[in-house]
Protein backbone atom coordinates (compact mmCIF):
# COMPACT_ATOMS: atom_id res chain seq x y z
CA UNK A 1 0.00 0.00 0.00
CA UNK A 2 1.38 3.44 -0.88
CA UNK A 3 2.19 6.02 1.74
CA UNK A 4 -0.40 8.67 2.60
CA UNK A 5 1.83 11.46 1.29
CA UNK A 6 3.65 9.84 -1.65
CA UNK A 7 3.09 6.99 -4.09
CA UNK A 8 5.46 4.29 -5.27
CA UNK A 9 5.78 2.91 -8.76
CA UNK A 10 4.86 -0.55 -7.49
CA UNK A 11 1.62 0.75 -6.00
CA UNK A 12 0.66 2.31 -9.35
CA UNK A 13 1.49 -0.90 -11.21
CA UNK A 14 -0.81 -2.84 -8.88
CA UNK A 15 -3.77 -0.70 -9.97
CA UNK A 16 -3.84 -2.39 -13.39
CA UNK A 17 -6.38 -5.05 -12.41
CA UNK A 18 -8.66 -2.60 -10.60
CA UNK A 19 -8.81 -0.36 -13.67
CA UNK A 20 -10.78 -3.02 -15.56
CA UNK A 21 -13.84 -2.26 -13.42
CA UNK A 22 -13.95 1.43 -14.41
CA UNK A 23 -16.63 2.34 -16.92
CA UNK A 24 -15.24 3.43 -20.27
CA UNK A 25 -14.74 7.20 -20.66
CA UNK A 26 -17.44 9.20 -22.48
CA UNK A 27 -17.86 8.05 -26.07
CA UNK A 28 -19.62 11.03 -27.60
CA UNK A 29 -17.87 12.35 -30.67
CA UNK A 30 -18.08 16.03 -31.68
CA UNK A 31 -19.32 16.63 -35.26
CA UNK A 32 -15.96 18.12 -36.24
CA UNK A 33 -14.29 14.81 -35.41
CA UNK A 34 -16.13 12.80 -38.03
CA UNK A 35 -13.99 11.50 -40.86
CA UNK A 36 -16.60 9.35 -42.59
CA UNK A 37 -20.24 8.93 -43.47
CA UNK A 38 -21.55 7.96 -40.03
CA UNK A 39 -20.84 8.18 -36.32
CA UNK A 40 -19.10 5.17 -34.87
CA UNK A 41 -20.75 3.60 -31.82
CA UNK A 42 -17.32 2.44 -30.77
CA UNK A 43 -14.52 4.63 -29.50
CA UNK A 44 -12.80 6.45 -32.28
CA UNK A 45 -13.15 9.25 -34.76
CA UNK A 46 -15.37 7.78 -37.47
CA UNK A 47 -14.20 6.28 -40.77
CA UNK A 48 -10.73 6.52 -42.27
CA UNK A 49 -9.95 6.20 -45.98
CA UNK A 50 -8.44 2.79 -46.69
CA UNK A 51 -8.25 2.12 -50.46
CA UNK A 52 -9.95 2.34 -53.86
CA UNK A 53 -11.68 -0.43 -55.78
CA UNK A 54 -13.77 -0.68 -58.95
CA UNK A 55 -17.45 0.13 -58.63
CA UNK A 56 -19.76 -2.89 -58.35
CA UNK A 57 -23.56 -2.94 -58.77
CA UNK A 58 -25.20 -2.11 -55.46
CA UNK A 59 -22.35 0.07 -54.16
CA UNK A 60 -23.32 3.36 -52.54
CA UNK A 61 -22.82 6.07 -55.16
CA UNK A 62 -21.94 8.52 -52.39
CA UNK A 63 -18.65 6.64 -52.05
CA UNK A 64 -17.67 7.33 -55.66
CA UNK A 65 -14.20 8.79 -56.09
CA UNK A 66 -14.81 11.15 -58.99
CA UNK A 67 -11.16 12.08 -59.49
CA UNK A 68 -10.11 8.44 -59.84
CA UNK A 69 -13.14 7.74 -62.04
CA UNK A 70 -12.25 10.60 -64.39
CA UNK A 71 -8.58 9.65 -64.50
CA UNK A 72 -9.16 5.94 -65.16
CA UNK A 73 -12.36 6.40 -67.18
CA UNK A 74 -14.08 3.65 -65.19
CA UNK A 75 -16.08 4.04 -61.96
CA UNK A 76 -14.12 3.65 -58.71
CA UNK A 77 -15.29 3.94 -55.10
CA UNK A 78 -13.49 4.78 -51.88
CA UNK A 79 -13.31 2.15 -49.12
CA UNK A 80 -13.12 3.12 -45.46
CA UNK A 81 -12.19 1.35 -42.28
CA UNK A 82 -13.35 2.29 -38.82
CA UNK A 83 -10.85 3.72 -36.39
CA UNK A 84 -11.55 2.04 -33.05
CA UNK A 85 -8.87 3.59 -30.88
CA UNK A 86 -9.19 7.03 -29.36
CA UNK A 87 -6.53 9.35 -27.95
CA UNK A 88 -6.66 9.69 -24.16
CA UNK A 89 -4.84 12.63 -22.58
CA UNK A 90 -4.46 12.95 -18.80
CA UNK A 91 -3.48 16.20 -17.04
CA UNK A 92 -2.28 15.58 -13.49
CA UNK A 93 -1.86 18.36 -10.92
CA UNK A 94 1.02 17.81 -8.48
CA UNK A 95 1.44 21.39 -7.30
CA UNK A 96 1.83 22.52 -3.71
CA UNK A 97 -1.87 23.16 -3.12
CA UNK A 98 -2.48 19.47 -3.83
CA UNK A 99 -0.26 18.51 -0.89
CA UNK A 100 -3.06 18.66 1.65
CA UNK A 101 -5.02 16.14 3.65
CA UNK A 102 -6.62 15.67 7.04
CA UNK A 103 -6.67 11.87 6.85
CA UNK A 104 -6.10 8.82 4.59
CA UNK A 105 -4.07 10.50 1.79
CA UNK A 106 -3.15 13.86 0.31
CA UNK A 107 -4.89 15.28 -2.73
CA UNK A 108 -1.62 14.82 -4.65
CA UNK A 109 -1.56 11.09 -3.83
CA UNK A 110 -5.23 10.71 -4.77
CA UNK A 111 -4.60 12.52 -8.08
CA UNK A 112 -1.65 10.22 -8.81
CA UNK A 113 -3.77 7.12 -8.20
CA UNK A 114 -6.68 8.43 -10.28
CA UNK A 115 -4.32 9.18 -13.17
CA UNK A 116 -2.79 5.71 -12.94
CA UNK A 117 -6.21 4.03 -12.90
CA UNK A 118 -7.33 5.99 -15.96
CA UNK A 119 -4.03 5.27 -17.72
CA UNK A 120 -4.46 1.56 -17.08
CA UNK A 121 -8.06 1.79 -18.34
CA UNK A 122 -6.75 3.21 -21.62
CA UNK A 123 -4.14 0.44 -21.74
CA UNK A 124 -6.85 -2.22 -21.42
CA UNK A 125 -8.85 -0.49 -24.16
CA UNK A 126 -5.84 -0.15 -26.47
CA UNK A 127 -6.32 3.62 -26.72
CA UNK A 128 -3.40 5.90 -27.48
CA UNK A 129 -2.21 7.55 -24.28
CA UNK A 130 -0.64 10.93 -23.62
CA UNK A 131 -0.37 13.12 -20.58
CA UNK A 132 0.98 16.07 -18.67
CA UNK A 133 2.15 16.00 -15.07
CA UNK A 134 2.91 19.37 -13.56
CA UNK A 135 4.40 20.74 -10.39
CA UNK A 136 4.95 24.29 -9.24
CA UNK A 137 8.09 24.91 -11.29
CA UNK A 138 8.17 22.47 -14.20
CA UNK A 139 6.22 19.78 -15.97
CA UNK A 140 6.45 16.64 -18.12
CA UNK A 141 4.56 16.35 -21.41
CA UNK A 142 3.97 13.17 -23.39
CA UNK A 143 2.23 13.07 -26.76
CA UNK A 144 -0.40 10.40 -27.43
CA UNK A 145 1.20 7.14 -28.50
CA UNK A 146 0.30 3.45 -28.22
CA UNK A 147 -0.21 2.70 -24.52
CA UNK A 148 2.66 0.21 -24.29
CA UNK A 149 5.04 2.97 -25.37
CA UNK A 150 3.65 5.68 -23.09
CA UNK A 151 2.36 4.05 -19.91
CA UNK A 152 5.70 3.13 -18.22
CA UNK A 153 7.14 6.62 -18.73
CA UNK A 154 3.89 8.32 -17.70
CA UNK A 155 3.84 6.38 -14.42
CA UNK A 156 7.46 7.42 -13.85
CA UNK A 157 6.46 11.07 -14.37
CA UNK A 158 3.66 10.73 -11.84
CA UNK A 159 5.97 9.22 -9.20
CA UNK A 160 8.69 11.83 -9.81
CA UNK A 161 6.40 14.83 -9.43
CA UNK A 162 4.47 13.28 -6.56
CA UNK A 163 7.69 12.84 -4.60
CA UNK A 164 8.88 16.32 -5.56
CA UNK A 165 5.85 18.06 -4.06
CA UNK A 166 6.25 16.07 -0.83
CA UNK A 167 9.99 16.80 -0.64
CA UNK A 168 9.52 20.54 -1.30
CA UNK A 169 6.86 21.11 1.37
CA UNK A 170 6.53 23.59 3.10
CA UNK A 171 8.74 25.73 0.85
CA UNK A 172 6.88 27.79 -1.73
CA UNK A 173 8.01 28.21 -5.33
CA UNK A 174 8.05 31.77 -6.72
CA UNK A 175 5.69 32.33 -9.65
CA UNK A 176 4.30 28.78 -9.66
CA UNK A 177 2.68 27.33 -12.75
CA UNK A 178 -1.05 27.87 -13.04
CA UNK A 179 -3.76 25.55 -14.28
CA UNK A 180 -4.09 27.85 -17.30
CA UNK A 181 -0.37 27.35 -18.04
CA UNK A 182 -0.75 23.60 -18.17
CA UNK A 183 -3.87 23.70 -20.32
CA UNK A 184 -2.03 26.01 -22.70
CA UNK A 185 1.08 23.81 -22.87
CA UNK A 186 -1.00 20.67 -23.38
CA UNK A 187 -3.33 22.04 -26.06
CA UNK A 188 -0.97 21.43 -29.04
CA UNK A 189 -0.67 17.74 -28.08
CA UNK A 190 -4.42 17.08 -27.96
CA UNK A 191 -5.92 16.02 -31.27
CA UNK A 192 -9.51 16.05 -32.46
CA UNK A 193 -11.57 13.18 -31.07
CA UNK A 194 -9.58 12.91 -27.83
CA UNK A 195 -10.86 12.29 -24.34
CA UNK A 196 -9.15 14.65 -21.88
CA UNK A 197 -9.14 14.12 -18.11
CA UNK A 198 -8.01 16.99 -15.87
CA UNK A 199 -7.18 15.83 -12.33
CA UNK A 200 -6.79 18.80 -9.99
CA UNK A 201 -8.46 20.69 -7.16
CA UNK A 202 -9.11 23.53 -9.65
CA UNK A 203 -8.34 26.14 -6.99
CA UNK A 204 -7.08 28.58 -9.64
CA UNK A 205 -9.80 28.06 -12.24
CA UNK A 206 -10.12 31.44 -13.98
CA UNK A 207 -11.18 33.13 -17.22
CA UNK A 208 -8.04 31.95 -19.02
CA UNK A 209 -8.91 28.38 -18.08
CA UNK A 210 -12.44 28.91 -19.37
CA UNK A 211 -11.16 29.91 -22.80
CA UNK A 212 -8.67 27.04 -22.96
CA UNK A 213 -11.21 24.46 -21.80
CA UNK A 214 -13.66 25.74 -24.41
CA UNK A 215 -10.98 25.25 -27.08
CA UNK A 216 -10.31 21.73 -25.82
CA UNK A 217 -14.01 20.94 -25.73
CA UNK A 218 -14.24 21.70 -29.44
CA UNK A 219 -11.72 18.91 -29.99
CA UNK A 220 -13.30 16.23 -27.85
CA UNK A 221 -14.70 15.20 -24.48
CA UNK A 222 -13.38 16.59 -21.19
CA UNK A 223 -13.82 15.15 -17.71
CA UNK A 224 -12.75 17.08 -14.61
CA UNK A 225 -11.77 15.11 -11.52
CA UNK A 226 -12.03 17.66 -8.72
CA UNK A 227 -10.02 16.27 -5.80
CA UNK A 228 -11.10 17.54 -2.40
CA UNK A 229 -10.80 16.83 1.29
CA UNK A 230 -14.08 16.67 3.21
CA UNK A 231 -12.76 18.50 6.28
CA UNK A 232 -15.55 21.09 6.02
CA UNK A 233 -18.09 18.31 6.60
CA UNK A 234 -16.29 17.01 9.70
CA UNK A 235 -15.57 20.21 11.62
CA UNK A 236 -16.47 20.16 15.31
CA UNK A 237 -18.80 22.81 16.68
CA UNK A 238 -16.31 23.92 19.35
CA UNK A 239 -12.54 24.13 19.73
CA UNK A 240 -9.52 25.78 18.14
CA UNK A 241 -8.60 25.47 14.47
CA UNK A 242 -5.15 26.35 13.09
CA UNK A 243 -4.66 27.15 9.41
CA UNK A 244 -1.66 27.98 7.24
CA UNK A 245 -1.59 29.05 3.59
CA UNK A 246 1.04 30.81 1.47
CA UNK A 247 3.11 31.73 4.51
CA UNK A 248 0.20 33.09 6.53
CA UNK A 249 -0.87 31.40 9.75
CA UNK A 250 -4.01 31.90 11.80
CA UNK A 251 -5.81 30.28 14.70
CA UNK A 252 -9.48 30.84 15.35
CA UNK A 253 -12.17 29.49 17.63
CA UNK A 254 -14.98 27.35 16.32
CA UNK A 255 -18.59 27.80 17.26
CA UNK A 256 -21.77 26.36 15.76
CA UNK A 257 -22.32 29.54 13.73
CA UNK A 258 -18.67 29.73 12.59
CA UNK A 259 -18.79 26.07 11.57
CA UNK A 260 -21.96 26.67 9.55
CA UNK A 261 -20.32 29.64 7.83
CA UNK A 262 -17.34 27.52 6.78
CA UNK A 263 -19.53 24.66 5.55
CA UNK A 264 -21.71 27.05 3.55
CA UNK A 265 -18.69 28.87 2.06
CA UNK A 266 -16.90 25.69 0.94
CA UNK A 267 -20.09 24.05 -0.35
CA UNK A 268 -21.02 27.18 -2.32
CA UNK A 269 -17.54 27.44 -3.83
CA UNK A 270 -17.61 23.80 -4.96
CA UNK A 271 -21.09 24.25 -6.44
CA UNK A 272 -20.00 27.38 -8.35
CA UNK A 273 -16.93 25.54 -9.61
CA UNK A 274 -19.03 22.63 -10.83
CA UNK A 275 -21.52 24.95 -12.55
CA UNK A 276 -18.72 26.87 -14.24
CA UNK A 277 -17.15 23.72 -15.64
CA UNK A 278 -20.48 22.21 -16.66
CA UNK A 279 -21.34 25.33 -18.67
CA UNK A 280 -18.19 24.69 -20.70
CA UNK A 281 -19.38 21.17 -21.48
CA UNK A 282 -17.01 19.55 -18.98
CA UNK A 283 -18.20 16.45 -17.13
CA UNK A 284 -17.49 17.06 -13.42
CA UNK A 285 -16.53 14.29 -10.98
CA UNK A 286 -15.96 15.41 -7.40
CA UNK A 287 -13.53 12.96 -5.80
CA UNK A 288 -13.27 12.95 -2.00
CA UNK A 289 -9.76 11.79 -1.13
CA UNK A 290 -10.83 10.22 2.18
CA UNK A 291 -13.18 7.78 0.42
CA UNK A 292 -12.49 4.76 -1.77
CA UNK A 293 -11.21 6.15 -5.08
CA UNK A 294 -12.08 3.15 -7.22
CA UNK A 295 -15.71 3.12 -6.09
CA UNK A 296 -16.02 6.80 -6.92
CA UNK A 297 -14.57 6.23 -10.39
CA UNK A 298 -16.88 3.26 -10.95
CA UNK A 299 -19.84 5.65 -10.87
CA UNK A 300 -18.68 6.91 -14.25
CA UNK A 301 -15.91 9.11 -15.58
Locate the predicted segments by residue.
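A positional/architectural concept
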Residues: 43-46
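N-terminal juxtadomain amphipathic helix
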Residues: 61-63
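Active-site SXXK
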Residues: 118
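Exposed, interaction-prone extracellular/peripheral surfaces
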Residues: 1-41, 54-59, 68, 77-113, ...
Amino acid sequence: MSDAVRVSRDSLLKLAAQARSIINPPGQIPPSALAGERISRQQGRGLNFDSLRRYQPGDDVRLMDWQATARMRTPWIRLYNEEKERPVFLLVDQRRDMFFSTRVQTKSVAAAKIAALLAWRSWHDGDRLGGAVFGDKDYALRACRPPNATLPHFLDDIVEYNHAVADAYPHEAPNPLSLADMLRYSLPLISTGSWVAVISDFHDLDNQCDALLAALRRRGEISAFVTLDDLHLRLPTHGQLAARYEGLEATFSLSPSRRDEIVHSVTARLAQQETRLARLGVRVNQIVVTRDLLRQLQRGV
